[in-house]
Amino acid sequence: MPFMMNKIAQNGTDDNFYKKIDLLSKSKFGNDFSVIYYKYYADKLRRENVSAKDNLQKIGAVNKWQFCGVFENLNGSGLDIEYEPETYAKNDKKFNANSNGMVHWYNVKDEDEDIIHFYANENEYGEGIMYAQTFIESPDDRTVLLELGSSSEFKAFLNDVEIVRSSDEYINEIGNYLVKVKLSKGMNRLLLKSELNNSTAIFALFSDEKKNRFTDLKYYNTYQNYQPKTLQE
Protein backbone atom coordinates (compact mmCIF):
# COMPACT_ATOMS: atom_id res chain seq x y z
CA MET A 1 0.00 0.00 0.00
CA PRO A 2 1.40 3.47 -0.85
CA PHE A 3 2.98 5.48 1.96
CA MET A 4 0.40 7.93 3.27
CA MET A 5 1.93 10.47 5.64
CA ASN A 6 4.02 13.61 5.18
CA LYS A 7 4.13 16.48 7.68
CA ILE A 8 2.09 15.34 10.66
CA ALA A 9 -0.48 17.57 12.35
CA GLN A 10 -1.63 17.25 15.96
CA ASN A 11 -4.47 14.94 15.01
CA GLY A 12 -2.09 12.56 13.21
CA THR A 13 -2.82 13.70 9.65
CA ASP A 14 -0.74 15.46 7.02
CA ASP A 15 -1.72 18.09 4.44
CA ASN A 16 -2.90 15.56 1.84
CA PHE A 17 -4.14 12.86 4.19
CA TYR A 18 -7.83 13.15 3.31
CA LYS A 19 -7.24 13.20 -0.46
CA LYS A 20 -4.95 10.18 -0.28
CA ILE A 21 -7.20 8.06 1.89
CA ASP A 22 -10.28 8.89 -0.21
CA LEU A 23 -8.41 7.80 -3.35
CA LEU A 24 -7.09 4.65 -1.69
CA SER A 25 -10.54 3.66 -0.47
CA LYS A 26 -11.75 3.66 -4.10
CA SER A 27 -8.70 1.80 -5.43
CA LYS A 28 -7.77 -1.89 -5.50
CA PHE A 29 -6.52 -1.39 -1.92
CA GLY A 30 -9.99 -0.38 -0.75
CA ASN A 31 -10.63 -3.62 1.14
CA ASP A 32 -7.25 -3.57 2.88
CA PHE A 33 -7.73 -3.46 6.65
CA SER A 34 -5.41 -0.48 7.08
CA VAL A 35 -7.19 1.52 4.38
CA ILE A 36 -10.59 0.87 5.94
CA TYR A 37 -9.22 1.84 9.33
CA TYR A 38 -7.69 5.13 8.15
CA LYS A 39 -10.80 5.93 6.08
CA TYR A 40 -12.83 5.49 9.26
CA TYR A 41 -10.39 7.73 11.13
CA ALA A 42 -10.50 10.42 8.42
CA ASP A 43 -14.29 10.40 8.26
CA LYS A 44 -14.52 10.64 12.02
CA LEU A 45 -12.23 13.70 12.03
CA ARG A 46 -14.37 15.28 9.29
CA ARG A 47 -17.56 14.40 11.19
CA GLU A 48 -18.79 12.37 8.22
CA ASN A 49 -20.66 10.14 10.62
CA VAL A 50 -22.54 7.92 8.16
CA SER A 51 -19.39 6.91 6.31
CA ALA A 52 -17.45 6.53 9.56
CA LYS A 53 -20.12 4.21 10.97
CA ASP A 54 -20.12 2.18 7.76
CA ASN A 55 -16.36 1.65 7.95
CA LEU A 56 -16.60 0.89 11.65
CA GLN A 57 -18.97 -1.95 10.79
CA LYS A 58 -16.68 -3.16 8.00
CA ILE A 59 -13.79 -3.48 10.44
CA GLY A 60 -15.91 -5.43 12.88
CA ALA A 61 -13.69 -4.87 15.92
CA VAL A 62 -15.04 -5.40 19.42
CA ASN A 63 -16.61 -2.12 20.51
CA LYS A 64 -18.62 -3.20 23.54
CA TRP A 65 -16.44 -3.08 26.65
CA GLN A 66 -16.98 -2.90 30.38
CA PHE A 67 -14.12 -1.73 32.61
CA CYS A 68 -12.76 -2.15 36.13
CA GLY A 69 -9.83 -0.41 37.83
CA VAL A 70 -7.45 1.15 38.53
CA PHE A 71 -5.69 -1.55 40.57
CA GLU A 72 -2.30 -1.25 42.22
CA ASN A 73 0.78 -2.09 40.15
CA LEU A 74 3.51 -1.83 42.76
CA ASN A 75 6.97 -2.26 41.19
CA GLY A 76 5.31 -3.61 38.04
CA SER A 77 3.95 -6.68 39.84
CA GLY A 78 0.26 -6.06 39.18
CA LEU A 79 0.02 -8.04 35.97
CA ASP A 80 0.85 -11.21 37.91
CA ILE A 81 -1.55 -10.51 40.77
CA GLU A 82 -4.97 -12.10 40.35
CA TYR A 83 -7.32 -9.33 41.37
CA GLU A 84 -10.93 -10.36 41.95
CA PRO A 85 -12.43 -9.01 38.65
CA GLU A 86 -10.27 -11.54 36.84
CA THR A 87 -12.76 -14.26 37.72
CA TYR A 88 -15.75 -12.24 38.97
CA ALA A 89 -17.53 -10.67 36.02
CA LYS A 90 -20.75 -9.42 37.63
CA ASN A 91 -21.32 -5.75 38.45
CA ASP A 92 -22.91 -6.32 41.84
CA LYS A 93 -20.01 -5.73 44.22
CA LYS A 94 -16.94 -3.58 44.77
CA PHE A 95 -13.34 -4.76 44.67
CA ASN A 96 -10.36 -3.73 46.78
CA ALA A 97 -7.84 -1.93 44.54
CA ASN A 98 -5.45 -1.49 47.49
CA SER A 99 -4.03 2.06 47.41
CA ASN A 100 -6.71 3.14 44.91
CA GLY A 101 -9.63 2.26 47.18
CA MET A 102 -12.74 0.34 46.13
CA VAL A 103 -13.71 -0.04 42.46
CA HIS A 104 -16.35 -1.87 40.41
CA TRP A 105 -17.22 -2.78 36.83
CA TYR A 106 -18.43 0.29 34.90
CA ASN A 107 -19.38 1.38 31.39
CA VAL A 108 -18.15 4.38 29.41
CA LYS A 109 -20.55 6.61 27.48
CA ASP A 110 -20.19 6.42 23.67
CA GLU A 111 -17.33 3.90 23.88
CA ASP A 112 -19.00 1.84 21.16
CA GLU A 113 -18.34 4.59 18.60
CA ASP A 114 -14.66 3.73 18.26
CA ILE A 115 -12.43 0.84 17.21
CA ILE A 116 -9.74 1.35 19.82
CA HIS A 117 -10.36 2.22 23.44
CA PHE A 118 -7.91 4.61 25.11
CA TYR A 119 -7.71 4.76 28.91
CA ALA A 120 -7.69 8.56 28.91
CA ASN A 121 -9.52 9.21 32.19
CA GLU A 122 -7.98 6.28 34.05
CA ASN A 123 -4.47 7.60 33.39
CA GLU A 124 -5.14 10.28 36.01
CA TYR A 125 -4.47 7.59 38.61
CA GLY A 126 -0.96 7.04 37.28
CA GLU A 127 0.50 3.60 36.68
CA GLY A 128 -1.82 0.74 37.52
CA ILE A 129 -3.77 -2.24 36.21
CA MET A 130 -7.00 -2.03 34.21
CA TYR A 131 -9.46 -4.76 33.26
CA ALA A 132 -11.75 -4.69 30.22
CA GLN A 133 -14.32 -7.37 29.47
CA THR A 134 -16.75 -8.09 26.67
CA PHE A 135 -19.24 -10.90 26.21
CA ILE A 136 -19.44 -12.57 22.81
CA GLU A 137 -22.50 -14.51 21.68
CA SER A 138 -21.68 -17.15 19.06
CA PRO A 139 -24.38 -19.10 17.19
CA ASP A 140 -22.20 -22.23 17.20
CA ASP A 141 -18.94 -23.76 18.37
CA ARG A 142 -16.20 -22.41 16.12
CA THR A 143 -12.46 -21.96 15.81
CA VAL A 144 -11.57 -18.31 15.25
CA LEU A 145 -8.60 -16.00 14.98
CA LEU A 146 -8.45 -13.37 17.69
CA GLU A 147 -6.37 -10.30 16.88
CA LEU A 148 -5.35 -8.30 19.94
CA GLY A 149 -3.64 -4.95 20.23
CA SER A 150 -2.35 -3.05 23.22
CA SER A 151 0.13 -0.24 23.69
CA SER A 152 1.33 -1.72 26.99
CA GLU A 153 2.02 -5.08 28.62
CA PHE A 154 -1.17 -7.14 28.87
CA LYS A 155 -2.78 -10.52 29.40
CA ALA A 156 -5.86 -11.89 27.66
CA PHE A 157 -8.32 -14.47 28.96
CA LEU A 158 -11.13 -16.31 27.17
CA ASN A 159 -13.76 -17.82 29.43
CA ASP A 160 -11.34 -17.31 32.36
CA VAL A 161 -8.44 -19.18 30.74
CA GLU A 162 -5.28 -17.21 29.92
CA ILE A 163 -4.66 -17.27 26.17
CA VAL A 164 -2.06 -14.51 25.65
CA ARG A 165 0.61 -12.76 27.65
CA SER A 166 2.52 -10.04 25.83
CA SER A 167 6.28 -10.47 25.63
CA ASP A 168 7.24 -6.94 24.60
CA GLU A 169 5.87 -3.44 25.08
CA TYR A 170 5.30 -1.80 21.72
CA ILE A 171 2.52 0.14 20.04
CA ASN A 172 0.43 -1.34 17.24
CA GLU A 173 -3.12 -0.10 17.58
CA ILE A 174 -4.61 -2.39 14.94
CA GLY A 175 -3.35 -5.59 16.48
CA ASN A 176 0.01 -6.98 17.47
CA TYR A 177 -1.00 -10.48 18.59
CA LEU A 178 -2.89 -13.15 16.66
CA VAL A 179 -4.08 -16.30 18.42
CA LYS A 180 -6.32 -19.18 17.38
CA VAL A 181 -9.06 -19.87 19.94
CA LYS A 182 -12.38 -21.68 20.21
CA LEU A 183 -15.64 -19.86 20.86
CA SER A 184 -18.35 -21.94 22.48
CA LYS A 185 -21.94 -21.87 21.27
CA GLY A 186 -23.75 -19.27 23.32
CA MET A 187 -21.98 -16.73 25.51
CA ASN A 188 -18.21 -16.27 25.91
CA ARG A 189 -16.21 -13.83 28.04
CA LEU A 190 -13.10 -12.06 26.73
CA LEU A 191 -11.02 -10.26 29.38
CA LEU A 192 -8.04 -7.97 28.77
CA LYS A 193 -5.77 -7.04 31.68
CA SER A 194 -3.46 -4.12 30.86
CA GLU A 195 -0.74 -2.09 32.52
CA LEU A 196 -1.54 1.62 32.39
CA ASN A 197 0.91 4.06 30.86
CA ASN A 198 0.30 7.53 29.43
CA SER A 199 -1.25 6.14 26.23
CA THR A 200 -2.61 2.67 26.99
CA ALA A 201 -5.15 1.47 24.43
CA ILE A 202 -6.81 -1.87 23.64
CA PHE A 203 -8.11 -3.50 20.47
CA ALA A 204 -9.73 -6.88 19.71
CA LEU A 205 -11.05 -8.42 16.50
CA PHE A 206 -12.42 -11.88 15.68
CA SER A 207 -12.08 -13.33 12.18
CA ASP A 208 -12.04 -16.67 10.39
CA GLU A 209 -8.85 -18.38 9.22
CA LYS A 210 -8.96 -16.40 5.96
CA LYS A 211 -9.08 -13.16 7.98
CA ASN A 212 -12.72 -12.47 7.05
CA ARG A 213 -14.55 -10.60 9.80
CA PHE A 214 -17.59 -12.29 11.32
CA THR A 215 -21.00 -10.68 10.91
CA ASP A 216 -22.93 -13.11 13.14
CA LEU A 217 -21.17 -12.52 16.46
CA LYS A 218 -22.89 -10.27 18.99
CA TYR A 219 -21.04 -8.27 21.65
CA TYR A 220 -22.30 -7.09 25.03
CA ASN A 221 -20.84 -4.62 27.54
CA THR A 222 -22.92 -5.82 30.48
CA TYR A 223 -22.72 -9.13 32.31
CA GLN A 224 -24.02 -12.16 30.44
CA ASN A 225 -24.13 -15.67 31.87
CA TYR A 226 -21.23 -17.67 30.40
CA GLN A 227 -19.50 -20.98 31.12
CA PRO A 228 -15.95 -20.63 32.51
CA LYS A 229 -13.44 -23.10 31.09
CA THR A 230 -10.33 -24.77 32.45
CA LEU A 231 -6.88 -24.98 30.91
CA GLN A 232 -7.47 -28.67 30.17
CA GLU A 233 -10.56 -27.84 28.11
Each model region followed by its residue ranges:
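Accessory carbohydrate-binding/adhesion or oligomerization-edge regions at the termini
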Residues: 15-111, 194-233
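Acidic, Ser/Thr/Pro-rich low-complexity intrinsically disordered segments
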Residues: 130, 150-158, 163
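Residue at a conserved register position within TPR or TPR-like alpha-solenoid repeats
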Residues: 5-9, 43-45
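Aromatic-lined ligand-binding clefts that engage carbohydrates, nucleic acids, or primary amines
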Residues: 138, 143-156, 190
